[in-house]
């Protein structure tokens, strides 16, 4: 999964990305 460092992203977004990454992997 690609993590984009944008001020607009919130902690929840990071968690969602991590969860999605686990699902894909």
Curated annotation (Swiss-Prot):
Keywords: ATP-binding, Chaperone, Nucleotide-binding, Stress response. One of its GO terms (molecular function) is ATP binding. Disulfide bonds: none annotated. Induction: By heat shock and primary alcohols. Belongs to the heat shock protein 70 family. Acts as a chaperone. This is Chaperone protein DnaK. It comes from Acinetobacter calcoaceticus.
């Amino acid at each position: 999964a690609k993590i984009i460092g944008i001020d607009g992203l919130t902690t929840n977004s990071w968690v969602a990305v991590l969860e999605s990454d686990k699902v894909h992997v």
